[in-house]
């Protein structure tokens, strides 16, 4: 499928899949063209400041309101409340295996950790998805938060109310709270999801960097209008207050013929990130790699930062170039899309994950430290890699499933054993 996109982060778009479907000069005329139904999707309170206000007007074949009551839907691997004890221990997981049984995106979501619940309107949850079939006659939406999807294996086709996005390894996609979508795959697919209960992701402030750098607004892509006119029973599953609920509609809800607004799904190619780094000495703080941020009520302290560690040149003189040893007030959930991470010589592999909570000691392993302290420093490019981090002010609590999983590496702490003691003489 040859898809078209509209470009710009947080831009105001208008698009129609059928000529003349968009009303002119008003949002909800007495008679919408072609008898379509006008519906506003609000992503913020009506009275939110203009620069924070997000909403889109949808013009659809049938009103969304015409459906039966929702009933509970069982999916015990996906959770949104994390009552279990937090742990100060460093945790690392090997990739979880994709099931042999047919499993679509909804049934393939597995929660690893989180630091709030949906009712708080703050915090995040970190999930993985393990998928081998497309969603068929099913549509999903999340009333609890927006979903930042990080594919690691296999391309996803995201068929949304507002159009179609494709996202494979090296891209991310963000689906706003409440937007309905279906996930289609060509084969096995695995990746990560940051479920954000707090303020919507936005671009970070650039400060002294200036007007350009990091993720540039023009590189974000939103879909153009596309719709389904399908009168086939469709199961609509929603996530509401941490639980899944399902109802059968008599048609596909992906029937939006035209829309205008600034609340949209979008995708971003991580290879377009304009990486900032030192050209003199030292390893700057990893905040320079922030792609998107969800702010909290404390300025400069994020509900969640989405950070990447992309290909980049290392040129610092008289410097230990990998990430240094660290104890952080923030908590860090990491994943690896492809390649290797420069602070870990082994064990942290594509599709895996790690968790370092607030003030948990972490840093390079013995092999990486030895190599970095002995290498002859010359300009060097770290290439063929893409790691990422969901960093949050809130401590993550791992799920029972994550702690009991065979993928949990029981020997993770061993990577920091064997450092020789410094000698003062």
UniProtKB/Swiss-Prot annotation:
Keyword Metal-binding among UniProt keywords: yes
UniProt-listed Pfam families: HgmA_C, HgmA_N
Active site annotation, chain numbering: 283
Substrates-to-products reaction catalysed: homogentisate + O2 = 4-maleylacetoacetate + H(+)
Enzyme Commission no: 1.13.11.5
CC cofactor: Fe cation
GO annotation terms (biological process): L-phenylalanine catabolic process; tyrosine catabolic process
HAMAP family named in the record: Homogentis_dioxygen
Record-linked NCBIfam families: hmgA
Family (UniProt): Belongs to the homogentisate dioxygenase family.
Protein name: Homogentisate 1,2-dioxygenase
Organism per entry: Caulobacter vibrioides (strain NA1000 / CB15N) (Caulobacter crescentus)
Name of the gene encoding the protein in the UniProt record: hmgA
